Amino acid sequence: LKYQQNKLIANERHEAWESVARKIAHEIKNPLTPIQLIIDNLKKKYSELFDEKNKESFLEKIKTINKQVKLIEKLVNEFSDFARMPKPIFKKNELNKIIKDSINLMKTNDKDIDINFVSEKVYFVNSDYEQLNRVFINLFKNSIESLNEKSEKMGNFQKKINVEIQFINDYINIAVNDNGKGFTNSNPKIFSKPYFTTKKEGSGLGLSIVEKILNDHNGFIEFISQKEGAKIKILLPKYGN
């Protein structure tokens, strides 16, 4: 009964956030095109009217405005993506393969990070391959960003991500540990709330999308503070359960 209540609450919460994201995307996207056109016209019309010194300053300011417009466009696309998330197409998938595929993709982007994967055996889940793949890519990406931020502050160290699968109490338990900077907020539950982010250029929707996908898969996610780094625990029902 408690599980059903939690799932109902999560569904209602995501429906509300999807509605908000849809409205935000619509309201912000409309004025972006005329803003971009005006910027382009200003650049064309006035850049040749300045002397060399002032022209450089003018173009630099135009470049800054353009960069901010592109950032807003990126955020709008993320809002739209969150609002239009497709329904999962379920079939029997090998969980180990989904995780390995995600790890291999991340390793091509950052070869300096040691990603270790341990599993007692091969597990299968009733899942949408693309969506679960997206979950692990999102989580690994966050871990890598945390490790790189710590490296910038502390200098070089052995950057590690450990992924382990176990079967506990009728659920497949996936633990993702890293030795990065850890959770800076004292309440880890807030990380999956939409629009909460610790990044300078982020919408805070990444982990909300992760939570939404896992909820659709009858799974759970937990963010655990620890002395060094961060731990994320995912529970998924085994195929056939």
Q: Model features per residue range: what roles?
A:
Residues 183-194:
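Short conserved segment of the HATPase_c
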Residues 214-215:
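Detector for a conserved hydrophobic position within an alpha-helical segment of the HATPase_c
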Residues 85-88, 124-127, 198:
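Conserved micro-motifs of the catalytic ATP-binding
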Residues 145-167:
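ATP-lid-like helix-loop hinge signature
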Residues 32-70, 90:
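Histidine phosphotransfer helical core of two-component systems
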Residues 102, 114-124:
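Conserved catalytic submotifs in the C-terminal HATPase_c
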Residues 2-26, 194:
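Conserved HAMP-HisKA connector
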